[in-house]
Amino acid sequence: MRNKQELDPVKYYDNISSKYDSTLNSNSDNSKIRDEVKHYFLKNVSGKIVLDFGGGTGKDLIWLAGNGFKIYFCEPSKGMREIALKNIKSLKSTAEIILMDELSSNFHNWNKNNIPIDNKLDGILANFAVLNSIKDLEDLSAKLALISRKNCRFIVSVLNVNIKRIFSRDLSVILRLFLSGYGFATQIKEGNNKMIVYLHTESNIIKTFGKYFNYVESFRIQKSSFRLFHFLRNEKEVV
């Protein structure tokens, strides 16, 4: 089996963190995608306590803080988190932003005896393919449910999985990773850095989060490679 550390998303983002923003900014479509997610989030989240899950370098903090949210910022990559901290310090905002540390940013550490936040959430944002870095969405669903109040809005953008296109382009990589125990996945490469990308279909995402979050809707964001999902926390308690 391939060395899993080699394809670890956290390690990948640590290594590319210094050029992440410039890479993202080089494609003007990314700002349009972020803007659409922003407007959708603001339209649907009425409470004031939110989680920016997998927040990267803090790009979404600008508008979250600007709209008066109390924000828990969760980013497991140290390199990305350090850049986000610099960006937070440069924000001219009175909004309360809680930067979660390395241990708290790992959702696998969350449980009933180790709640990473002080207030239950009204909204959760997971933007720009955060879920595609995570294999076990069922565990993530339970952990997010643990820290969410009833009717918390969970809004997430993930890679839109086009089976035909992916198989025609990445079939050999997909087969190799599947046989190595990664499940349905491909990989991306930036210089010498590689990262696993888990391919979650629309039906799988809806089914996986359905235990604790009711499905509201999903749609493709403009003509991009992203799909937006909207879920609503139900009453089911996490066992």
Q: Can you say where each PLM-predicted feature lies in the sequence?
A:
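Conserved class I S-adenosyl-L-methionine
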Residues: 1-45, 47-56, 59, 63, 155-181
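Class I SAM-dependent methyltransferase SAM/SAH-binding core
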Residues: 55-109
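A short glycine-rich, Lys/Arg-flanked "PGG" loop and its adjoining helix->strand segment in the class I
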Residues: 138-153
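Short alpha-helix
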Residues: 192-213
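A short acidic, Gly/Pro-enriched loop at the edge of an enzyme's catalytic core
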Residues: 108-124
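A short SAM/SAH-binding and catalytic strip from SAM-dependent methyltransferases
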Residues: 122-137
